[in-house]
Amino acid sequence: DLTVRDVEPHMPAMDAYYEAEYLRDGDFWCSHEGSTAIWLDQYRYVCHLAGIGHDAEGVAQTVHEAYRRAECWETYADVTACLRALKERGYALGVVSNWDAGLEGLLRDLRLLPYFDTVVSSAVVGYRKPNPVIFNLACEQMGVRAESSVHVGDRPDADGDGAAAAGIRAVIVDRHDAEKDCGYERVTALTDLLELL
């Protein structure tokens, strides 16, 4: 049986594999089939690195199915409090994500969906960040103007550049203080937004 101990040493290689694919052509995020394929490819890759290539397909499918369940996720401690505070202040909140068609269900199962007025997933709409179209779709669905909006994300390339191209103020959540020179406003905790906005 594959354990976390078997896989953990190979996670940096899996992350590098994903980043290389994303930079080569991140359009896999524009369809449910494409996003599923990239996840399965990553899991098979880790299986081969961990020396279990003989059952890589079965393990990849099992991991992918588990990954879609809320119990396999843990939100940062500041998420719910920040979302609640923003809603109490009257902000319209939306999700813009390079994700598969299961995003809304996952957010529901994590009990986060009620905080959001819209969820825009790249696999559902056919556009991915940093394309400004996906940001504009979210603004349109929420009935807000781009120039009065703020996009909060963790990737300067997808989130910062995409929001800026759409005319939206960008804030990067940099929990590990690794993006000091990203060119966008930064916070190291989500609750820092409450002072920034």
Task: State where each predicted segment sits.
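N-terminal helical cap/lid subdomain that shapes the substrate entry/recognition surface
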Residues: 1-77, 89
